[in-house]
Swiss-Prot record:
UniProt superkingdom: Eukaryota
Entry GO terms, CC: cytosol; Lsm1-7-Pat1 complex; Lsm2-8 complex; nucleus; P-body; spliceosomal complex
Function: Component of LSM protein complexes, which are involved in RNA processing. Component of the cytoplasmic LSM1-LSM7 complex which is involved in mRNA degradation by promoting decapping and leading to accurate 5'-3' mRNA decay. The cytoplasmic LSM1-LSM7 complex regulates developmental gene expression by the decapping of specific development-related transcripts. Component of the nuclear LSM2-LSM8 complex which is involved splicing nuclear mRNAs.
Tissue: Expressed in roots, leaves, stems, flowers and siliques.
Cited InterPro entries: Lsm7, Lsm7/SmG-like, LSM_dom_sf, Sm, Sm_dom_euk/arc
Ranges for domain Sm: 6-86
Protein name, per record: Sm-like protein LSM7
Amino acid sequence: MSGRKETVLDLAKFVDKGVQVKLTGGRQVTGTLKGYDQLLNLVLDEAVEFVRDHDDPLKTTDQTRRLGLIVCRGTAVMLVSPTDGTEEIANPFVTAEAV
């Protein structure tokens, strides 16, 4: 076994492509992945943050904020997903009575 650390995720296929990143604390940003390291620190260009609802911080609004070039610290990254090729579906585990 070599002494070189490898990343948990292989993000090489997402470099120069759009990604969505969810961070601890509920922040959510999208942008073009420009780089990353073995600690999952991410560099995003043309980043846009989705502003959360003041009444319900778990929901995002249609309002966005342009951030430009940012670094997402790896310890704060909860989820990384491509923006292309994904679609939102209804939650099959939520019943009409629970809503």
